Amino acid sequence: MPFTFKLFHVDDSRCGMPVSTDGVLLGAWAPLVQAKTILDIGAGSGLLSLMAAQRSLAKITAIEVDTDAALDCQQNFNASPWFDRLEVICCDIQAYAQAHTQVHSQAHNHAEQSKQFEHIICNPPYFANGPQSSNVSRATARHTDSLSFDSLLAAIKQLLSPEGCASLILPTESVSLFETKLSTYQLELSQKLLAASVEGKEANRQILVLRHTSALAHDPKTETEPAVVAKLEDAAQQQLYIREKNGQYSQAFSLLSRDFYLKL
């Protein structure tokens, strides 16, 4: 159903996955660190791209494989205040990475190197087993058949700039498998946020921030904006819960999302 935020509107009526708290949490918390270029993998309705556009001055490319979702995404971009910094491309991320590698190689006539982004953001599909929805768009958005962890990490390795970072949100039960694959793609975890739905519950979601292995040896925070520094310090505690036991949003989540939600 359509969802109105403070500065933009999201129509997700044709998307396999509707606007969710997961997406809002990732979009609000991801350490953009003044990124000038951002890639949104599996953009859906464009929520993450729109949140990133509100938080930054970056040029943002959204990749969405589902035609109907890409139409919603384009419509939402066109209606936003940042339409001139947002683009959506309807294709899968593997095809996008391959095409940009070839174009760059032909233009520069040297070893392959992709167009790269300073930040990559993704709310990926994570169900590896179990029955799939009869709704093709929903199945694509939720199951790793459409984008495996290996394919996603290969794309991040190829498309992430040397000093850039990638932010992803996963269910806690999927994190161990995901993390075992990082070294294969010369990626390492630089930050992690554990998020619980309710105070006192175990974390059911985790935001992982990845960087190239070589980037971790020289990772000064000198250019990090003050607002982001505070978030990174909070992330070091590796905890955040969305709601208090009384059902109200927690102070931490309210602070993160108050620039977006109408009623905060």
UniProtKB/Swiss-Prot annotation:
Q: What is its EC number?
A: 2.1.1.223
Is Cell membrane set as a keyword in this record?
no
Q: Name one GO biological process term.
A: tRNA processing
InterPro entries linked to this entry:
DNA_methylase_N6_adenine_CS, rRNA_Ade_Mease_Trfase_CS, SAM-dependent_MTases_sf, tRNA_Adenine-N(6)_MTase, tRNA_adenine-N6_MeTrfase
Disulphide-bonded residues: none
List, alphabetically, the GO terms of the cellular component aspect: cytoplasm
Task: Report keywords, A-Z.
Answer: Cytoplasm, Methyltransferase, S-adenosyl-L-methionine, Transferase, tRNA processing
* CDD domains in UniProt: AdoMet_MTases
Membership in a protein family:
Belongs to the methyltransferase superfamily. tRNA (adenine-N(6)-)-methyltransferase family.
Q: What does the UniProt record say this protein does? A: Specifically methylates the adenine in position 37 of tRNA(1)(Val) (anticodon cmo5UAC).
What is the protein's name according to its record?
Answer: tRNA1(Val) (adenine(37)-N6)-methyltransferase
